[in-house]
Amino acid sequence: MQAELVIKNGLVILETGEVITDVAVQGGKIVAIGQDLSGERVIDATGLVVSPGMVDAHVHITDPGGGYRDEWEGYVTGTAACAKGGVTTFMEMPLNQIPATVDKTSLEIKYKAGENKLKVDVGSFGGVVPTNLAGGIQELDEGGVSGYKCFLGTCGDRSIEGDFQNVDDYSLYEGMKQVAKTGKVLAIHAENAPITEK
């Protein structure tokens, strides 16, 4: 069989270890791994690593901007940097942009901000904040977030409308109950505000 693409002589990372070998690709999928494979197109990967794309589970992107963070990392440079480093998918945190990703409207704004800018796949975390306990968590679930994030310690800039907010004990408890109904994870930035604010 001759595949569309063969990556030859690369250091291939396998479940059992690493080996210098060839990888055949057909229709965007790996169809064979072994020696002396042939393909219509051949890439010589001698001296290079051939591995599955990596997933970065914690990335902050500031598109669509907001407040003093407009010059921080956006989708164009952030996703290009990921691709350059071998990261093919990342999970975006719900804060550092205005508005924070805490309901249907803010999630749609975030998705729109990324249109035609992505060089890699992106999944979204939705925020659990005191202001989205009346439907926002469910809206985020319906919008396709992969999980949720909250902060126990003080966060966000209270002078910027729509910025991320930390939870108190009650909103954490209520938020956890709602997230549990979605079957998704809740990542907790776990600090103790009275200690961290000193």
PLM feature spans:
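Short, acidic/polar
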Residues: E71-T79, P130-L140
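Short, well-ordered coil/turn segments that N-cap beta-strands
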Residues: V87-T88, N116-S124, G144-S146, T182-K184
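Divalent metal-coordination and catalytic microenvironments
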Residues: G10, G28, G47, H58, ...
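Alpha-helix-loop-beta-strand connector modules within alpha/beta enzyme cores
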Residues: S51, K104-V120, D169-I188
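Histidine/acidic residue-rich metal-binding segments in metalloenzymes
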Residues: N132-K198
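Hydrophobic faces of well-ordered beta-strands that scaffold small-molecule active sites
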Residues: G53-V59, F90-E92, V122-G126, Y148-C150, ...
